[in-house]
Amino acid sequence: MSALKTHIAKVAAGTALSFEEAREAFDIIMSGDATPGQIGGFLMALRVRGETVSEISGAVATMRAKMLRVEAPAGAIDIVGTGGDNSHSVNISTGSAFVIAAAGVPVAKHGNRGLSSLTGAADVLIALGVKIDIPPDAIGRCIHEAGVGFMFAPAHHPAMKHVGPTRVELGTRTIFNLLGPLSNPAGVVRQMVGVFLPEWILPVAETLKALGTEHAWVVHGDGYDEITTTGETQVAELIGGEIRSFTLTPEEVGLKRHTKDELRGGDAAYNANALRDMLDGAAGAYRDTVLMNAGAGLVIAGKATTLGDGIALAAQAIDSGRALQVLDRLVEISNG
């Protein structure tokens, strides 16, 4: 039970772990060979000193090696946030996933229950009637036939059972908030990742680059781990091995600026009703924010060349009724 101590001492001394050292440290943790005290000490030492790209990349490599995989069509994307933004908003990336799928791009959605919000992706999907505790082959069928499938993180990362209790006891953000969105069980190489603080935009983009991602947007908007309509969104786009940074506002793509109160969510039933209404064509802040996020997803997937084009395709996907049909089909197939 002492194998992790060397790594704890190194991090506590302010030294960064190499990719291989981080991979080894997280293998020890996720194999059940560290005590809760050691895990907690290691995670907080990383957090206080600040996690590096090599450490995040090494940890993700271990996560990916141990996860239960799902087969998804070529070109599938993920749209996911780290959580930890304490925004208590409606479910933006989950709503966007249905719109992206309705526009013809398969979505392998990875997510969890609410950690920093009242209602995470898993919570709202259950409230909508989606069955989430289904085997990998059934999830693959959902992606192929409905256009979207949901991979419940704890089911696909069973090694996380060794860190779950410690994370709950710590009650604060750790490196694991970053690892989940980077460890998609379908192995997508195109994705949008929202992060809880703007200082994590570039490190996460650099990590995705190191791990071979083809095209990604890493975003943070006005306190949200999403693209927002409440203010400015900071973006790092990774494409072709190069990273460029830019900002977005709703006005520059022809959308209205909204308030945070307009995006505030509630419990799972409240958020489920709001999501279904949005997919059914309800206008307002939720729709506009989903249009921006889904539009970006369509750019990442190569379905649209500009964000404006992506937003137009996303609007068509909602207004045609196709987005709501995707949700209904997912409910049907997941329960089949």
Curated annotation (Swiss-Prot):
<feature type="binding site">
    <location>
        <position position="81"/>
    </location>
    <ligand>
        <name>anthranilate 1</name>
    </ligand>
</feature>
<comment type="function">
    <text>Catalyzes the transfer of the phosphoribosyl group of 5-phosphorylribose-1-pyrophosphate (PRPP) to anthranilate to yield N-(5'-phosphoribosyl)-anthranilate (PRA).</text>
</comment>
<dbReference type="InterPro" id="IPR036320">
    <property type="entry name" value="Glycosyl_Trfase_fam3_N_dom_sf"/>
</dbReference>
<feature type="binding site">
    <location>
        <position position="167"/>
    </location>
    <ligand>
        <name>anthranilate 2</name>
    </ligand>
</feature>
<keyword id="KW-0808">Transferase</keyword>
<dbReference type="GO" id="GO:0000287">
    <property type="term" value="F:magnesium ion binding"/>
</dbReference>
<dbReference type="GO" id="GO:0000162">
    <property type="term" value="P:L-tryptophan biosynthetic process"/>
</dbReference>
<feature type="binding site">
    <location>
        <position position="81"/>
    </location>
    <ligand>
        <name>5-phospho-alpha-D-ribose 1-diphosphate</name>
    </ligand>
</feature>
<comment type="subunit">
    <text>Homodimer.</text>
</comment>
<keyword id="KW-0822">Tryptophan biosynthesis</keyword>
<protein>
    <recommendedName>
        <fullName>Anthranilate phosphoribosyltransferase</fullName>
        <ecNumber>2.4.2.18</ecNumber>
    </recommendedName>
</protein>
<comment type="similarity">
    <text>Belongs to the anthranilate phosphoribosyltransferase family.</text>
</comment>
<dbReference type="Pfam" id="PF00591">
    <property type="entry name" value="Glycos_transf_3"/>
</dbReference>
<keyword id="KW-0479">Metal-binding</keyword>
<feature type="binding site">
    <location>
        <position position="121"/>
    </location>
    <ligand>
        <name>5-phospho-alpha-D-ribose 1-diphosphate</name>
    </ligand>
</feature>
<feature type="binding site">
    <location>
        <position position="112"/>
    </location>
    <ligand>
        <name>anthranilate 1</name>
    </ligand>
</feature>
<keyword id="KW-0057">Aromatic amino acid biosynthesis</keyword>
<dbReference type="GO" id="GO:0005829">
    <property type="term" value="C:cytosol"/>
</dbReference>
<feature type="binding site">
    <location>
        <begin position="91"/>
        <end position="94"/>
    </location>
    <ligand>
        <name>5-phospho-alpha-D-ribose 1-diphosphate</name>
    </ligand>
</feature>
<dbReference type="InterPro" id="IPR035902">
    <property type="entry name" value="Nuc_phospho_transferase"/>
</dbReference>
<feature type="binding site">
    <location>
        <begin position="109"/>
        <end position="117"/>
    </location>
    <ligand>
        <name>5-phospho-alpha-D-ribose 1-diphosphate</name>
    </ligand>
</feature>
<feature type="binding site">
    <location>
        <begin position="84"/>
        <end position="85"/>
    </location>
    <ligand>
        <name>5-phospho-alpha-D-ribose 1-diphosphate</name>
    </ligand>
</feature>
<feature type="binding site">
    <location>
        <position position="93"/>
    </location>
    <ligand>
        <name>Mg(2+) 1</name>
    </ligand>
</feature>
<feature type="binding site">
    <location>
        <position position="226"/>
    </location>
    <ligand>
        <name>Mg(2+) 1</name>
    </ligand>
</feature>
<feature type="binding site">
    <location>
        <position position="89"/>
    </location>
    <ligand>
        <name>5-phospho-alpha-D-ribose 1-diphosphate</name>
    </ligand>
</feature>
<keyword id="KW-0460">Magnesium</keyword>
<feature type="binding site">
    <location>
        <position position="225"/>
    </location>
    <ligand>
        <name>Mg(2+) 2</name>
    </ligand>
</feature>
<keyword id="KW-0328">Glycosyltransferase</keyword>
<comment type="pathway">
    <text>Amino-acid biosynthesis; L-tryptophan biosynthesis; L-tryptophan from chorismate: step 2/5.</text>
</comment>
<feature type="binding site">
    <location>
        <position position="226"/>
    </location>
    <ligand>
        <name>Mg(2+) 2</name>
    </ligand>
</feature>
<dbReference type="GO" id="GO:0004048">
    <property type="term" value="F:anthranilate phosphoribosyltransferase activity"/>
</dbReference>
<keyword id="KW-0028">Amino-acid biosynthesis</keyword>
<dbReference type="InterPro" id="IPR005940">
    <property type="entry name" value="Anthranilate_Pribosyl_Tfrase"/>
</dbReference>
<dbReference type="InterPro" id="IPR017459">
    <property type="entry name" value="Glycosyl_Trfase_fam3_N_dom"/>
</dbReference>
<dbReference type="Pfam" id="PF02885">
    <property type="entry name" value="Glycos_trans_3N"/>
</dbReference>
<dbReference type="InterPro" id="IPR000312">
    <property type="entry name" value="Glycosyl_Trfase_fam3"/>
</dbReference>
